[in-house]
């Protein structure tokens, strides 16, 4: 059997990793051994943070809804409970948008929530 030389495949693999490490600082951008570790770690961070992004946006929406609801004299939990009792099914993303950009509409929702809590 002929001898297999791996120069071409090794070069391609090194180029691929170094291309992924483009823009990194120091030896991480041009030393294969260091760049490989940096790219692996970047991938781990990306995987983790794609999941965290969903949690962080939900937290942001809840904070915005809470602030707007408190301006209208109702806490977040009571507001959400009131909406549920009034059978108004609007998700937190839309509620947060209304709280920021459509304050009058949000105030109407708060009034409906208050009415359903009182009933």
Swiss-Prot record:
Positions of disulphide bridges: none
One GO cellular component term noted in the UniProt record for this chain: ribonucleoprotein complex
Domain of life: Bacteria
PROSITE patterns reported for this sequence: RIBOSOMAL_L20
MF annotations from Gene Ontology: rRNA binding; structural constituent of ribosome
Annotated SUPFAM superfamilies: Ribosomal protein L20
Annotated Pfam families: Ribosomal_L20
Keywords for this protein: Ribonucleoprotein, Ribosomal protein, RNA-binding, rRNA-binding
Keyword Transmembrane in record: no
InterPro entries membership: Ribosomal_bL20, RIBOSOMAL_L20_CS, Ribosomal_protein_bL20_C
One GO process term, biological-process aspect: translation
Function, as annotated: Binds directly to 23S ribosomal RNA and is necessary for the in vitro assembly process of the 50S ribosomal subunit. It is not involved in the protein synthesizing functions of that subunit.
Entry's family note: Belongs to the bacterial ribosomal protein bL20 family.
Protein name: Large ribosomal subunit protein bL20
The species this protein was found in: Laribacter hongkongensis (strain HLHK9)
């Amino acid at each position: 059997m002929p001898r297999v030389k791996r120069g071409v495949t090794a070069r391609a693999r090194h180029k691929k990793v170094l291309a992924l490490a483009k823009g990194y600082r120091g030896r991480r951008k041009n030393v294969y051994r260091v760049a490989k570790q940096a790219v692996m770690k970047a991938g781990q961070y990306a995987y983790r943070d794609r999941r965290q992004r969903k949690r962080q946006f939900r937290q942001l929406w809840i904070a915005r809804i809470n602030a707007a609801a408190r301006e209208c004299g109702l806490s977040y939990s009571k507001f959400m409970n009131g909406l549920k009792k009034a059978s108004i099914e609007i998700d937190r993303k839309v509620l947060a948008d209304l709280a920021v950009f459509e304050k009058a509409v949000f105030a109407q929702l708060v009034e409906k929530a208050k009415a359903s809590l009182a009933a």
